[in-house]
Amino acid sequence: QEDTKYADRNATKNGAKVGGELSDFERIHFNAVKAIKHFDLPEEEQMFFQAEVLVKNFIPLEYITNIANFGIPIPSQPKQLQIKTPYTAQITRNTPTAFIFLVDHSASMQNETTLLGEKMTMAEAAARIVNLQINELVLRCIKSNEVRHYYDIAVIGYDEEAYSDWKGELEGRDFVSPEELRDSPYKKIVTREEKRTRKGVVVKEVEKVQWIEANCDGSWTHVHKAFDRAKRLLTEWMEKHHEKDCYPPTIINITDGWFNGASNDYVLQQANELKSMFTNDGNVILFNIHFTNEDTVESIACPIMKEELNNDEYAEMLFDMSSLLPERYNADISRCLNDNRDGRHRAMGVNADATTLIKLMDIGTPTNISQNQ
């Protein structure tokens, strides 16, 4: 029967109608499909929600194999039976990954904090920590005096607008390669760094490379514009790498407070759309880190349950916006945060001081680089 090629009323309790025309297919609002509900479900149930969405929107079965899966990794050779664990792809020159750092440049970032015993503005601390992490990423790419292209890295600053945050020769660029970063430093500064010695941990002055600069001139915190820019960059990156088994890109958003200029629902929808983007190895990971100068406020990092947030409205908003981390991250969370609990953690931090921010950045930058490729 011709009708058996399509979803019928028996396929779902909601009573989908027969509909195999292109007009039926065009009725689907895919942004609505990427609803909060999908990400709130346990991982083992997400595929059933996906199937119900496809069926009740009258999609002809012949089209289903060509539709994005809203969260389930698609194998690079779909006609072959494969068993694949997400977030296990090796990072190589042929299968790179990407990092996007989003940095709040609003005026409140001029408040003071302490980084390794040195007083400075939160903007300066955030810039130093991001520069430190970028430098670490570049160092991971150096093999036998060769800088290998394992990563594409972008930094987006935001206040009233969102823009490329690179300085110097890279100014105005979006994604740049590790080799370009090594060859185009903006400037070098002397900072303090903890060093382990036989006498214990000591703080020494060391020279550090900078690619971005502290900025707290903005009046607003328009994170929705930063998310829009990040989505555009990732869309282009995904199109370039869609046939490869690439480790999913990571977005790390650092802010000191509430965003403004857009509703909570709108920003949450943007976050869900970013999290719904995927490679053949899994979905994009979105970290949201609330950076503070208050040592007296309890810091919350990578919680498992909302109950840990003490009914903090802002923390609960970040919880909903942030990715549910794969269990492979648990070892890093245990190492950095001394949190040995089983379960899936959220990629978030609230009231994070400079030390906690460093730890969260370390968790957010995976190290599964191939040693030979």
Give, region by region, the residue ranges found by the protein language model.
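…and closely analogous acidic/polar surface helices at protein-protein or active-site interfaces
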Residues: 109-150
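Phosphate/oxyanion-binding active-site loops and adjacent basic polyanion-contact surfaces
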Residues: 95, 119-130, 215-230, 263, ...
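Von Willebrand factor
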Residues: 178-246, 285-297
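Short beta-strand-loop
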Residues: 146-209, 297-308
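Acidic, polar low-complexity linker/tail segments
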Residues: 78-122, 235-244
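DG-centered beta-turn motif at the end of beta-strands
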Residues: 101-106, 126, 230-231, 247-264
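P/S/T/G-enriched low-complexity
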Residues: 80-96, 144-148, 241-249, 258-373
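Active-site-proximal loop/hinge segments that shape catalytic or ion-binding/gating pockets
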Residues: 2-78
